[in-house]
């Protein structure tokens, strides 16, 4: 075997360290967080740098196919963590479709017992498939590669007697990757918000409860101080979301406000240092969610979103509901109506709870 000549060996020992010092650093794999446009509901997809995937909620039942299509477009074949922030139909109604298409590693659930058919079907399916099931509370933390997922709420002792105990039992997540963080509070209202002594600053805030005034106040907005705030809602929804007070609070805290009804699906990408985003609709100079909340016209996107309105009928009781109603029938007992008149003509009467 030939040995290295002394001169060449000495030269190599000098040059190699210099090459290593000046070699460009390998780019870190990105973390992506997608707030999907699912109408008046929530669904957030998280693609971790290590290749694992998390889905937080899946919108209402009609949104299920939309979520499935998006996940397939991203090449998802398995969901490692499926989070049901709380049991309302506009957050977990689409989960049944997800469970029927993708294998799921584990489910995180708020643990709040709502008693609706939607929740019963959800829990029954998890049990039948033998999926690992947990109810993480404040203080729980999970490392996913180089990213960290923290649970900030709900507290170990459930809240009761609030305006909405279900909303105030939402799993509140904070996902951190390097210097960039995302706060996902479900439908948290003021009761649950008060259980967190100090809210951490976060780069991106998925606004609580579709922009309702009970989900965000000025003190909370300033504490979190997000660069971006995304509101998931449908144009023309019966609740008036997002409320003007919420938009004002977010803007006062310096956030750029985006909305799924007008900006479409919003995708954030970060390497842990910088962050960028894209939307499925052309962004306007003034954030569209803010324009709608102040009564300004939002153009064609606003009228297009109203086409997503539909109603769900109960085949047995002949009662029809809004998709977000808490008393929806089981999936096998549902019939979909595109308009209210269609339901009435077919002999269905409106639900007294949701007043469709």
Predicted regions and their residues:
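Bacterial N-terminal signal peptides
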Residues: 10-21
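Residue-level signal for mature regions of secreted extracellular proteins and peptides
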Residues: 12-14, 318, 344-347
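Residue-level recognition of short loop/turn positions
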Residues: 50, 316-317, 342
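Immediate flanking context of iron-sulfur cluster ligation sites
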Residues: 307, 314, 343
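A broad, structural micro-motif
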Residues: 117, 320, 337-338
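Compact, charge-rich alpha-helical regulatory domains located at protein termini
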Residues: 326, 330-356
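Short aromatic-glycine-(Arg/Gly/Cys) micro-motifs in beta-strand/loop hairpins
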Residues: 311-330
């Amino acid at each position: 075997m030939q040995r290295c000549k002394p001169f060449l060996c000495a030269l190599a020992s000098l040059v190699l360290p210099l090459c290593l010092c000046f070699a460009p650093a390998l780019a870190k794999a990105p973390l992506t967080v997608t707030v999907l446009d699912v109408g008046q509901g929530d669904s957030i997809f998280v693609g971790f740098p290590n290749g694992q995937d998390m889905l937080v909620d899946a919108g209402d039942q009609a949104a299920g196919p939309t979520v499935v299509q998006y996940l397939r477009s991203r090449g998802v074949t398995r969901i490692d963590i499926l989070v049901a922030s709380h049991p309302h139909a506009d957050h977990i109604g689409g989960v049944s479709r997800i469970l029927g298409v993708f294998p799921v590693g584990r489910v995180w659930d708020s643990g709040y017992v709502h008693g609706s058919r939607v929740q019963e079907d959800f829990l029954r399916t998890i049990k039948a498939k033998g999926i690992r099931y947990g109810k993480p509370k404040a203080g729980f933390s999970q490392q996913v590669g180089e990213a960290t997922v923290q649970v900030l709420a709900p507290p170990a002792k459930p809240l009761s007697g609030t305006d909405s105990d279900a909303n105030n039992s939402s799993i509140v997540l904070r996902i951190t990757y390097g210097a960039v963080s995302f706060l996902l509070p479900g439908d948290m209202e003021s009761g649950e918000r008060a259980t967190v002594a100090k809210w951490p600053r976060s780069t991106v805030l998925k606004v609580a409860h579709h922009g309702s005034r009970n989900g965000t106040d000025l003190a909370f907005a300033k504490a979190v101080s997000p660069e971006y705030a995304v509101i998931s809602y449908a144009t023309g929804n019966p609740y008036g979301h997002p409320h003007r007070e919420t938009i004002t609070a977010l803007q006062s805290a310096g956030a750029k406000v985006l909305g799924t009804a007008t900006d479409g699906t919003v995708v954030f990408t970060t390497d842990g240092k910088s962050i960028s985003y894209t939307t499925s609709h052309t962004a306007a100079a003034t954030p569209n969610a803010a324009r709608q909340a102040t009564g300004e016209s939002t153009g064609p996107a606003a009228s297009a979103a109203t086409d997503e309105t539909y109603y769900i009928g109960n085949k047995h009781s002949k009662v029809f509901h809004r998709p977000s109603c808490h008393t929806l029938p089981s999936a096998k007992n549902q019939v979909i109506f595109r308009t209210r008149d269609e339901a009435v003509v077919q002999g269905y009467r409106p639900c007294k709870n949701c007043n469709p």
